Amino acid sequence: MGMTSDTIADLLTRIRNALKAEHLYVDLEHSKMREAIVKILKQHGFLAHYLIKEEHRKRTMRIFLQYTNDRKPVIRQLKRVSKPSRRVYVPAAKIPYVFGNMGISVLSTSQGVLDGSTARAKNIGGELLCLVW
């Protein structure tokens, strides 16, 4: 697929496909934004862990996927909200609660990439990047 114009959608698609294929991990090009999103997913138990590798001045990320004891993906759904063609911004009060609060929203804010509950607590809105549950 190469570098698409929407690296976040690409990240979510690659994770989705890897989970469908029951892969242990997925490798992709590193970016600060991608790492920030992956870090939040890991903090919330949606991903096992990740590594950043540097080879020939190229940084790649290896994301280790998380499965339940009976080998089902922990992530049910990854949904891109804001897109390069149609940006979606929300104030703190409009940050969605996801999947009966078992899921998370990820926002790009003036204070960096945050999960919805953190942004809500800080009373800051931002660009609604994606929903995960």
Curated annotation (Swiss-Prot):
Entry keywords, A to Z: Ribonucleoprotein, Ribosomal protein, RNA-binding, rRNA-binding
Pfam family, one: Ribosomal_S8
Transmembrane segments: none
UniProt similarity note: Belongs to the universal ribosomal protein uS8 family.
SUBUNIT field: Part of the 30S ribosomal subunit. Contacts proteins S5 and S12.
HAMAP family per record: Ribosomal_uS8_B
Name of the protein this chain belongs to: Small ribosomal subunit protein uS8
